[in-house]
């Protein structure tokens, strides 16, 4: 399956033991053509409901309805690659405001400017 950048998808965690996984949301960060098709993988960021966090980079998701989430959640810059075929389903997409904020956070934390 091909997923667009900033789609929210459901993936199995952890990836190391296929017999003991839980389904968790994640945000697709990679370009579907330049990275996804070429490598068969997607670069993603974790989505969490953890409100008490020591991660200063946690970004609240404002538009939870478009994202397909059922309650308050945060994008956590805990990044990982996952094979395309392990993605269970697409659940939604970040809203435009959330996309702008996430792009700014990535630029800030990875000194991309």
Q: What residue ranges belong to the model's regions?
A:
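Short, charged beta-turn/beta-strand-edge "cap" motif at the junction between a beta-strand
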Residues: 14-18
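C-terminal terminal-subdomain/extension
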Residues: 1, 64-113
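Compact nucleic-acid interaction/catalytic patches
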Residues: 19-23, 28-60
